[in-house]
Amino acid sequence: MSELETFLIQNWENTELSKEYDIFVDDEVTGQQFQTDTGRIDILAISKDKKTLLVIELKRGRANDKVVGQLQRYMGFIKDEFLENGQKVKGLIIALEDDLGLRRALSVTSDIEFLRYKVKFELLNTHIN
């Protein structure tokens, strides 16, 4: 579990994602570090209308086109093993930066989006006696 993941989970309600999605919870299974047969989904969310499951993959630095295949494996698992009638699955990559390979791969993949995050670093003056 990364610091980025922890921060996003703890601050979910303060993000744009919370307007459309909630973090998936079903009985004792949660959408954080959601286990599949091809790895762990960082965050699994479900739309407020329960019609769309969103597979979120987080990358600390630069994301490249390899993450598209990883995300598609997770989305395939959700589609095959988890979706109920009428539901669909989408993917979201969140990273600090992207590269040309990722942009090319996403240009032909309509069910995966990319969002950049920004870190604000601030130094605070502290008075020590």
Regions found by a protein language model. Name each.
Residues 1-129:
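Charged, terminal alpha-helix-loop-beta segments
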